[in-house]
Amino acid sequence: MTNITNIGFFCQGIRVVKITDWLNWATFMETTTDQWAVVLPMIQRGSVWKPHQVIDLWDTILRGMPFGGLMASHIPAVSTLEFFHPLKRTLVNLPANGGLSLIDGQQRTLAMLIAWPAVDQQMQRRIWVDFGEDDNYDHLLRLHFTTESSPMGYQRGGPSGQAIGRLSLAERRLANATYADRMAAIRAAEPANSVKLRYLHDDEITPWHSTLALDLRLLIERHQEGAQALRTYVENQAQDAKVKLDARITLIKAKHVPFDAYDDALLEAIISHLRKRITTIEKCMGSSERATRIHVLEQGLERMTRQHFPVIEVPEHLMHAEEKDEKKDPPLAVLFKRIGTGGTDLKTSDYVFSVLKHLNPKCHSLVETQLKSTQISAIYTPTDLVMSAVRLVAAQIEPEKDQPKLDKAQFTRLLRDEKKFQRKTPKSPASLLNSTNKLGSMAHL
C-alpha cells in the first residue's frame, strides 16, 4: 500500500478529503497527524461570492450533495514561494508537511469558513439559520446572510440561483435607527478600523427580515458538543431573543439617547416591527415546527461530518513557471482565467495586483499599510489602490500618455520595460510605495 505522506499530499493526481479536515487545515488547526495548511497563492480574484451563492452552497452541504472538486498544488515547506492565510491578509510560513495552494475553490472554501467554529469572529460575513419560519422555495431551512456592508442582512431569499436583493433604503434607515445606540456604543469602545466588524458580530443584532435567526457558526459549535447541547442552545436563544426585543421596545419608549431625537412616526414604525417579531417568536415557541427545524439541522450537520470531496492536483511546476513569450501570460494566470470561465473571472485589476505580488511580495504589505487608514480604505479597495498607483508610475515613465483604463496588454508592455517600470516597482518597491503614499495624502484632503 502506498504511503501518501512519503510522496506528498496527492496520489495519482488526486486526493479525497473530508470537509471538516479541509476547514481545519484552512484555519491551521492541527486535529490529525496528517496536518496540512490550506493557503492562497499570490494570484487571486478580488471579488467575493454573492449572498445567494453562499446560501446555496450551505444548503448543498446540509443536504449531503456533492459540490464539485477543488484544485490545489502541494507546496513543500522549503519552497521559496510566498502565500496568504485564507482568513487574514498576512503572509504565512508553511508547516512541516507543506501547504496546499488553493487554485480553484477559494470562494467555496471561504464560504464554508464563514460558519466554522475555529474561525470565531474573524470573518466579515455571517450566515444564519431561522428557526422561526420555513423556506418557501427549495432550501432545507430558511437561511440569512449578513456582511460588514449589510449588517442588517438582505431581502428574503428566493429559489436556488436567484440573486437576493439588498434591503430597501427605507428598510435600511429603519433598521439602523432601531440599533443606533449599539453603533454609538461600539464606536466609543472600539478602534475605528474594527467598528464595522464588531457591529456585524454584535449580540443584539440579527437579520432585519428574520424571525428567530441564530448564527450557524455557533450552532455548529453546539452540535460538536452533542445533540442535546444544540437543542438546549436553540431553546435558550428563543427565550433570550424575546427578552431582548421586549427590552429594546422599553428602551425606545423611554426615549433615551439617541431615540429621544426620533419623531413619533419613526418610533411607531420601529416598535411595530419589533412587536411583530415577538409575536412570531411566541407562536414558534408554542408549536412543534421549531423542533422539526432543529432536527433537520442536526441531520444536515451529521451529513457534513461524513462528507468528502476531491482535490485535484495542479502540478507544482506551474506555480514557478514563467511564460517565455513576453506577450503571453504565465501558465498559472492562464489556468486561473480558464477555470474562471464557469465562475468568477480574473479581472484586470486582480491580475495586475497578483503579478506585482508574485514579482515582489512586499507590494502586498505596502498596500495593506495604506489601507489601515480608514480615510483611505473608505475610498480605495486594495485593487483600486494598486491600479491607481500603477497609473501614477506609468505616468512618470511616459508623462505624455495617460491610461485611464489600463488593460493587461498595456500592463504587460510596462513590465517588459525593465529599465523603467520593473526598476521602479518589482525590484525596488519604493516608487509604488511613493505612489500609494501620494494617493493616501489625497484621501486625507
Where are these regions (language model features)?
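A cross-family structural signal marking well-folded subdomains
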Residues: N6-C11, V17-W22, V352, P382-L445
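Positively charged N-terminal leader segments that act as targeting/secretion signals
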Residues: T2-N3
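Basic- and aromatic-enriched surface patches that contact anionic nucleotides/nucleic acids
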Residues: F10-S47, W58-A395
